[in-house]
Structure formats: C-alpha cells, structure tokens
Swiss-Prot record:
Family note: Belongs to the cytochrome f family.
Protein name in the entry: Cytochrome f
Role played: Component of the cytochrome b6-f complex, which mediates electron transfer between photosystem II (PSII) and photosystem I (PSI), cyclic electron flow around PSI, and state transitions.
Gene: petA
Oligomeric and partner information: The 4 large subunits of the cytochrome b6-f complex are cytochrome b6, subunit IV (17 kDa polypeptide, petD), cytochrome f and the Rieske protein, while the 4 small subunits are PetG, PetL, PetM and PetN. The complex functions as a dimer.
UniProt source species: Morus indica
GO molecular function: electron transfer activity; heme binding; iron ion binding
Signal peptide: 1-35
HAMAP family in UniProt: Cytb6_f_cytF
Subcellular location: Plastid, Chloroplast thylakoid membrane
Cofactor note: Binds 1 heme group covalently.
Pfam families: Apocytochr_F_C, Apocytochr_F_N
Length: 320
C-alpha cells in the first residue's frame, strides 16, 4: 500500500513538473517569436498614426514592398476577398532570438473602412476557405472590428494572405453610405529591430558607444561578445555588449570611432504599407445602369430595323 502511494506521489510530481515547465516555456518564448502583433496592440490605440504611418514601422526599420488587391466595387452585405501579398526571397534566413538562423515569419494589419469587418465563418464560401487554410484573424481591438491583424505565420506558406471581408449594409447601419472608401494595409516579413521599450533586438546593427582602441573581445559562452574600448585620451574603459546573432566586424587593437558599426546588419526582412480603394455600390444604381444600357441597346436595334424597313420601301419605289 505504501509503495502504491509513493508511486502515485512520484507520478503527480512528474506531471506537475512538466506542466510548470510548459507554462514557463510558453511565457518566455511568446515575446520572442509570437508577440510582435501584440506589441502594437498593447502600445497603440490605433495602428495608423495621423500622418498615415502605420506604427509597425517603429519596430521594423527596413522598408520593403507590400501589395493589396480588392474588388473595384462591392454590393452591401457581401463577402469579398482582400488579398495581401508580402513578397520576399523564400531562401532567406533570419537571425532568431537565440542567435541561430531560421525561416522568416510574416504578419499583416488590414485597416478597413468603418462598418467593414471579418466575415463570419458561415458566410465564407468553400473557395475562400480553401485559400484561408488554417489562418486565424483577430480584431485589433474588440471595439475596432474594422481593423484586422494576422501573424506571425510561416512566410514560406503565407506570403500571400486572403482576408474574408463582409461589406456593411447602409439599410441597417445608418452611419455607412454608398461611397468610395480607402483601405490601408501594412505587412512585415522577419523580426523587428527595435522593441516597444526602445531597446534593440539582436536583429540589428550594434555601434560603438565610445571612440578609442578595442583592447579586449570576450566571446560569451552562450553567444555574443563583450567588447572593451579604451579611450586613448583619458584611459577610460567602456564595455559594449553584443548579443548572439550579428557578426563581429572589429578586432582587438583596432582603432574605432564613435558610432562606428561593431557588427554587420543581420536584418533580411522589413515592413511595407500600401492602400487601395473600394466602392460600396448601391444595388438600385446598378439596376438603373443596367436598365439604361438595355434601353440604349433596344433603341439601337429599333433604329437598325427602322433603317432596313426604310431601305426596303425606297427599293420597292425605285423598282415600281
């Protein structure tokens, strides 16, 4: 009986240890690999500043292209696709938080007009569902359903992201009108260079904080370097810490200047933003246009028939 209790206690302790380890892993890993859309959500009420700049550019410093494709016009209460393309060389590898090389992730923020929102699952067609695959979209804020974020997701699989969007109906939403509206998009590939608190990530260039002579370079056990710089004028020592990832460009005994790069730039990613326009079309206006075109076609047909009839009359009179 005592042996059974002992075995049960050991089993419970092992399960508890595994659970605690898993929780610690999730907490410590999330800010490194899965948190960069959350950085913007936590720090900014609106992802688009008054200047038109999307705040993701504050952390992703390199400028890269992004493209968005939407229909020219949509009818009310209709599901349509907004396709965001984040192009990059799929062979590229980025510096991860631990200093090793790995594949790039991508992410995007889509800023829709007020009233437009993510389409509910029961309104999405099988064709669009196939394009979406396993992607999970979320609102930037519970109160901002027109702003959607996605990522990070594997760039090799999702460099093209399809958002299923539901257009509003002015008949039920009085603040929505049949107009032309702008749509804004931001898309990044790879990790950022700056964290929200202003500190550098290891996906960045590290510069000398002092001029002088590099007197000592210590390679740290877990990667990275400690570089000691001695000021030639007063002998003051400054130690610059380089995290794992960037490649060192200086050597011991080398004379360096203030702000001189100590490392290469490991960043291969970047952020881009773009915009598009979409018209919320009034169905009555479309019907009116179709009727107008139909009337023109009928008028042309009657005109041709009348002309042929007139020609026949003329021909018969000439024969008479």
């Amino acid at each position: 009986m005592q042996m059974r209790n002992t075995f049960s206690w050991i089993k419970e302790e092992i399960i508890r240890f595994i659970a605690v380890s898993l929780i610690i892993y999730i907490i410590t890993r999330a800010p490194i690999s899965n948190a960069y859309p959350i950085f913007a959500q936590q720090s900014y009420e609106n992802p688009r500043e008054a200047t038109g700049r999307i705040v993701c550019a504050n952390c992703h410093l390199a400028n890269k292209p992004v493209d968005i494709e939407v229909p020219q016009a949509v009818l009310p209460d209709t599901v349509f696709e907004a396709v965001v393309r984040i192009p990059y060389d799929l062979q590229l590898k980025q510096v991860l938080a631990n200093g090793k090389k790995g594949a790039l992730n991508v992410g995007a923020v889509l800023i829709l007009p007020e009233g437009f929102e993510l389409a509910p699952p029961d309104r999405i067609s099988p064709e669009i569902k196939e394009k979406i695959s396993n992607l999970s979209f979320q609102s930037y804020r519970p109160t901002k359903k027109n702003i959607l974020v996605i990522g990070p997701v594997p760039g090799q699989k999702y460099s093209e992201i399809t958002f299923p969007i539901l257009s509003p109906d002015p008949a039920t939403k009085k603040d929505v009108h049949f107009l032309k509206y702008p749509i804004y998009v931001g898309g990044n590939r790879g990790r950022g260079q700056i964290y929200p608190d202003g500190s550098k990530s290891n996906n960045n260039v590290y510069n000398a904080t002092s001029a002088g002579i590099v007197s000592k370079i210590i390679r740290k056990e877990k990667g990275g370097y400690e570089i000691t710089i001695v000021d030639a004028s007063d002998g003051r020592q400054v130690v610059d810490i380089i995290p794992p990832g960037p490649e060192l460009l200086v050597s011991e005994g080398e004379s360096i200047k203030l702000d001189q790069p100590l490392t290469s730039n490991p960043n291969v990613g970047g952020f881009g933003q773009g915009d598009a326009e979409i018209v919320l079309q009034d169905p009555l206006r479309v019907q009116g246009l179709l009727l107008f075109l139909a009337s023109i076609i009928l008028a042309q047909i009657f005109l041709v028939l009348k002309k042929k009839q007139f020609e026949k009359v003329q021909l018969s009179e000439m024969n008479f």
